[in-house]
């Protein structure tokens, strides 16, 4: 059976993704760090979700990236786009927790997400398994990854979009710690990929978060 049957629209949408026999550099980077790489390639969409936190310390902008990489019949695919890995300025200064705003710590989080509804409203990836966050509590308009205050657990760290109809340029209130895609159309394509992946490989998605300097 052709696993692409029934997802012609997705094939059209993925024309811009990079296809190459060579391993993507983000996959090489996470492999070097000792993280698991999913590369069983008899069926498509065995996803490696790699988020890259920018070296640029500027806050409230979508200056990070996410790569959805999978290998199919010996050929790698790399669909990538801008995101934010970090909370917006509003939530940095108005944390939901008295311990501070949640910033996802770099690492690999097995089965972190499943498909579901973000805040009960629209299809997204929602937290299923524990994640480790660093608490930024000093309200200094900067992302503080060295506070020393860490927590592991369920904090509603989802992957969702910003504005539903147009691209978002400032993070603002869109993220209180979630990984957020600023572009609604690209997010729709993402969700098509996750739907297909969950049918084939199960409804469980691992996040690997690294620094730009790891590349």
Feature map (PLM): residue ranges:
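Cell wall/extracellular polymer interaction/catalysis modules
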Residues: 2-172, 186-195, 201-205, 212-214
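Helix-capping/helix-break motifs at membrane-protein junctions
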Residues: 182-183
């Amino acid at each position: 059976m052709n696993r692409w049957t029934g997802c012609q629209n997705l094939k059209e949408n993925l024309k811009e993704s990079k296809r190459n026999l060579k391993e993507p550099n983000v996959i090489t980077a996470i492999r070097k760090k000792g993280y698991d790489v999913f590369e069983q390639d008899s069926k498509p969409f065995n996803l490696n979700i790699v988020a890259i936190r920018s070296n640029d310390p500027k806050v409230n902008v979508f200056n990070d990236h996410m790569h959805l990489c999978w290998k199919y019949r010996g050929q790698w695919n790399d669909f990538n786009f801008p995101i934010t890995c970090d909370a917006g300025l509003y939530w940095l200064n108005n944390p939901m927790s008295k311990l501070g705003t949640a910033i996802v710590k770099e690492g690999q989080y097995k089965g972190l997400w499943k498909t579901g509804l973000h805040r009960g409203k629209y299809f997204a990836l929602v937290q299923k398994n524990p994640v480790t966050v660093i608490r930024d509590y000093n309200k200094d308009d900067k992302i503080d990854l060295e506070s020393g205050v860490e927590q592991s657990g369920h904090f509603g760290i989802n992957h969702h979009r910003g504005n539903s109809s147009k691209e978002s340029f400032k993070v603002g209130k869109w993220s209180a710690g979630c990984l957020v895609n600023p572009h609604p159309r690209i997010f729709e394509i993402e969700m098509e990929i996750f739907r297909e992946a969950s049918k084939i490989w199960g409804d469980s998605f691992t996040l690997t978060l690294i620094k730009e300097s790891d590349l």
